């Protein structure tokens, strides 16, 4: 059943049922699903017309939800990654880190052709609540078909996707740009 809701509990229930959800993030609207549900993930790819090789970001509500993905990092780098997530104010640009990952940690469809996984711990209140209600991290990729600008409102997201998914209505965060992406192993900025 397709729905529009302001209830985080209803939105999390949709994710648990293998459905796709559009929701506001720090800077743009995102599309999300249970990262371990391949059918839901492939629906996102079809909606976006995105190749599976690109991979997607995982969004967590707190460090505890992705702690096991930090295990292979050097302790100094690990501390830097965690600090970047936990000390950022709500109006600062979000940071997504590329972390080394093995295929037994996350499904290969999440990483695409890469040997790293893109992870962000959010401080956007609605996204934090959604991840907590879902009881884990979720897929987060911008709500737009390939080649078009990401949606910045419910109206734009629904214009792109219509009745093809569920919508959690709420406010965008205060950031004006999508997250910065940094390779945790090399320190290289992938997207500034």
Swiss-Prot record:
One of its GO terms (biological process) is tRNA threonylcarbamoyladenosine modification. SUPFAM superfamilies: YrdC/RibB. It is found in: Cytoplasm. InterPro entries: DHBP_synth_RibB-like_a/b_dom, Sua5-like_dom, TC-AMP_synthase, TC-AMP_synthase_SUA5. It is an enzyme of class 2 (transferase). It catalyses: L-threonine + hydrogencarbonate + ATP = L-threonylcarbamoyladenylate + diphosphate + H2O. GO terms for cellular component: cytoplasm. GO terms for molecular function: ATP binding; double-stranded RNA binding; L-threonylcarbamoyladenylate synthase; tRNA binding. Keywords: ATP-binding, Cytoplasm, Nucleotide-binding, Nucleotidyltransferase, Transferase, tRNA processing. Its EC number is 2.7.7.87. Residues 5-192 form the YrdC-like domain. Required for the formation of a threonylcarbamoyl group on adenosine at position 37 (t(6)A37) in tRNAs that read codons beginning with adenine. Catalyzes the conversion of L-threonine, HCO(3)(-)/CO(2) and ATP to give threonylcarbamoyl-AMP (TC-AMP) as the acyladenylate intermediate, with the release of diphosphate. This is Threonylcarbamoyl-AMP synthase.
